[in-house]
Amino acid sequence: MATAVGSGSDVEVGFAKLQGEDFEYYMQSYSIILGRNSKKSTVDVDLSSLGGGMNISRNHARIFYDFTRRRFSLEVLGKNGCFVEGVLHLPGNPNVKLDSQDLLQIGDKEFYFLLPVWSILGGPLGPRHHVLGKATVVPYHNYHSGPGSGSGKNGVRSRELYEYDDEDDDEEEDIRGSGKKTWRDGHEGVYASGEKKREGRSKADREADDQQFLQLMHGSGWSVTDIKGVWKRMASQSSKKIPITRRLGYP
């Protein structure tokens, strides 16, 4: 779960970190769901409870490590989309490559995606190099419009871009016996039969990813024997501070 800034938590390990004005979240798995909790299911990061507003879908976005491309990516699931570095991405767009210090906005909530100083595959990390391709995305300018961006009249964008998302509670259909969950927008998720419907990876999937990840680490010269060793090493190199020009609400 996301931790409030200043809560005194000693848990500072993860492959990546989400940092907002008033919360931080350390990724300790290779795939997390951002959205809002409901009576039927929970998500890894409940943005609604963090002040994300009424435009948060129950399953709004997924951040995951793409083992094929060896990078973190964002998959947009919620109909209101996500902003990454001021560009709106909608469901059906290609997955978005995430670089360290990328600014994300979902609903009224702004936060940074941060990686350790050194890549999990070796080599220093730098900020995003912007290359505009032919992807069907909608640009949005002036997302650093002034202090307090993300809420109120001086927020980074108008609420008119959004639809009120009150229909998500019926959005999922259980396909009994198939282990699949389908959303009306065509996306599918998979969960083990009989387990509580939590939008996350199964234990078997996580363990398989752990083994694959450790193999990549050994190939990159990292002397670690278990996944906790990777967490600790990455946490020790974690990006603790954001340059002043990248802080939330900076004019």
Swiss-Prot record:
Residues 163-174 have a biased composition (Acidic residues). InterPro entries: FHA_dom, Fhl1/FHA1, SMAD_FHA_dom_sf. Gene3D superfamilies: 2.60.200.20. Induction: By auxin, cytokinin, gibberellin, abscisic acid (ABA), brassinosteroid and hypoxia. SUPFAM superfamilies: SMAD/FHA domain. Pfam families: FHA. GO terms for biological process: regulation of ribosomal protein gene transcription by RNA polymerase II. Its main location: nucleus. Residues 32-89 form the FHA domain. Transmembrane segments: none annotated. It comes from the Eukaryota. One of its GO terms (cellular component) is nucleus. Residues 163-209 are annotated as: Disordered. Keywords: Developmental protein, Nucleus. May play a role in the control of plant organ development. Does not show transactivation activity in yeast. This is FHA domain-containing protein FHA1.
